[in-house]
Amino acid sequence: MLSAEEKAAVTSLFAKVKVDEVGGEALGRLLVVYPWTQRFFESFGDLSSADAILGNPKVKAHGKKVLDSFCEGLKQLDDLKGAFASLSELHCDKLHVDPENFRLLGNVLVVVLARRFGSEFSPELQASFQKVVTGVANALAHRYH
C-alpha cells in the first residue's frame, strides 16, 4: 500500500494535526458539502446552515472522535481491515451507513489537510494521504462485502 517513505511522511505530518480542530472541520464540511449525510446526525441539533454545522459542538466532538479513530488506524497501516473491523461492523450492522460516505469523508479530510498545511501538503504527500484514506474507507466498508 505505502512505501516506508510514504508512511514516514504521513506519520510526520499527522503528528502536527490538531485532531479536535481538523476532525470537527472535516465532519462539518462533509455535512455541508454532502447534505444527505446529515440524516445520520439528526440528534446533533441545528444543522440548518454551514455556520450552524461548523459551529455545532456535537459535530466538533464527533469529528474529533472520528479523527481519533483514524489516528489509531495510522498505527496499523499494514492491517487497516483489522484496525477498523469493529467500526466496520458497527457502521454496517447497527448504523446502516452507506459505505460511500467513508470515501467522501476521506476526500474531505484531504481537502482540510491541504487547506491547513498549504505548501507543506505537497502533491506527493497528498497522493500518500489519498492512499491512506482510500485504505481506511475500504477497511470500513469491509463488513458490507
Swiss-Prot record:
Coiled coil: none annotated. One of its GO terms (molecular function) is heme binding. Residues 1-145 form the Globin domain. One of its GO terms (biological process) is hydrogen peroxide catabolic process. It comes from the Eukaryota. Red blood cells. Keywords: Heme, Iron, Metal-binding, Oxygen transport, Transport. It holds the Pfam family Globin. InterPro entries: Globin, Globin-like_sf, Globin/Proto, Hemoglobin_b, Hemoglobin_oxygen_transport. GO terms for cellular component: haptoglobin-hemoglobin complex; hemoglobin complex. Gene3D superfamilies: Globins. PROSITE patterns: GLOBIN. Heme b binds at residues 62, 91. Heterotetramer of two alpha chains and two beta chains. Involved in oxygen transport from the lung to the various peripheral tissues. Belongs to the globin family. This is Hemoglobin fetal subunit beta. The lineage of its organism: Eukaryota, Metazoa, Chordata, Craniata, Vertebrata.
